[in-house]
Amino acid sequence: MRFIFIIIFISFSSKGQNLYFPGKLWEEKSPESQGIDIKKLDKAIEFAISNENSVDKDLRISIIKSFGREPGYKIKGPTKKRGDSNGLIIKNGYIIGKWGDTKRVDMTFSVTKSYLSTVAGIAYDKNLISIDDKLKDYIWDGKFDDTHNSQITWHHLLNQSSQWSGELFGTYDWADRPPRGLSLEEIKKQKLLPPGQAYKYNDVRVNLLSFSLLNVFRKPLPAVLKENIMDPIGASSTWRWYGYENSMVVMDGVNVQSVSGGGHFGGGIFINSEDHARFGLLFLREGVWNGERLISSDWINKIRVPSENNPSYGYMWWLNRGDRYWKGLPENIYYGSGFGGNYIIVIPDHDMVIVSRWLDSSKVGEFVKMIVDSHN
C-alpha cells in the first residue's frame, strides 16, 4: 500500500512539474499536437469573428444607449473606443489558436469584477478580512451604520446579495438597473430584503466592495493587484484600472482613487487579451504560477460555490449552472463576463482557457461548445 502511494505521489508531482507557464513570450503549439482537430478549431474561430457583438465601436455611445435611462445617469470614468473581435484559445498552457489583435488594450467592463474578487481573495489570504465578518467592523464612515446595512458581510458583497442602501460617489443603489415601467418615486421606494436574502446585480454595491477593500489595504487596489498577481504572472505594463472623476478618497493624508468594478459608469479595467489569458491560466492552475502559490486553494474553491440566491453566480465569477447553463458543457466551467461580449472562460475538464473579446453574448455557449467538441 505504501509503495502504491509513493508511485501515485511521484506521478502527481511529476505532472505538476511538467506544467507549462509562459514567460515573457508565450509559446504557441499546433492544435494537432494538443489533441485538437484543426479544422474544427478554425471553424470555431471563424464563428467568433463572424458573430462580433453589435455594440457601437464608440463605447461611450454604447454605454449611454444601454444605461442612460437610469435615474441621474452619468458617465463618470474614462471610456475608450473598442477594437475588433479578438481572442485566444489556451490548451495545456499553450496558445493553440488566436484571432485579431490580442495585444490591443480595451475596456473589459464587468470582467473587472473577477479581478476585484481576486483582490478580496488577497485580503482573505493575508488574514485582513474574514468572509463572514460584518463591514461595520471595518468601515466606520457611516456607510454601514444603520440597522439594515450593519448586517452586511463580505460574503454578501462578493455574491451581490448585500441589499445595501445608500449613495456612493453620487449614485444611489436604487438608480442602478431599476425595473422598467416604474416612476422615480416608485423606484426609490422599492422594498429591500434583509442582507443575504436576494441577488441583485448592482455596480454601486460592487463599487462599495472596492471602496471597502481600499480601506482595508490602505493603498490603491491596482497596486495590490499588480504586486500580488499581475507582475508574478508576467502581465504586460499596458493594463490600467480606473475609478471615477469623483471617487478620490483621502487615505492616510494622500488622495487615492477608489476604482470601479466595471465600466457601467465608465472606468474599470482596460486590458489586452493576452493579459486576460494569463489571469485565466492562473485560475486554471488553481492559483499557482510556475511553482509559486499566488492565491490560496481555499479562495479558489470559494469563488466557485454557487451563491444562495443565484446558482449561476459565485464570488463575482459566473458558473455554468442554473439560468446561465451552456448545454452540453461541464458544470465546473466558470468565467468572467463583461458588457459587449468580453469573456475569460476557464474549462478545468479540458485544461483550457478561452479569452474572447466583443463576441455576440447570445453565441458564447455555442462558441465554447465548438471549441470543446474540437478535441480528437
Task: Indicate where each model-derived feature is located.
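Active-site SXXK
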Residues: D37, G93, M107-D132, L157, ...
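Catalytic-site signature segments of enzymes, centered on catalytic residues
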Residues: I95-G100, E167-Y244, G267
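Active-site-proximal alpha-helical segments within enzyme catalytic domains
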Residues: S114, R205-S212, G267-V288, N342-W358
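Active-site helix/loop module of the DD-peptidase/beta-lactamase fold
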Residues: D125-W164, F217-H264
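Active-site Gly/Thr loop motif
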Residues: S247-G263, G267, V305-V353
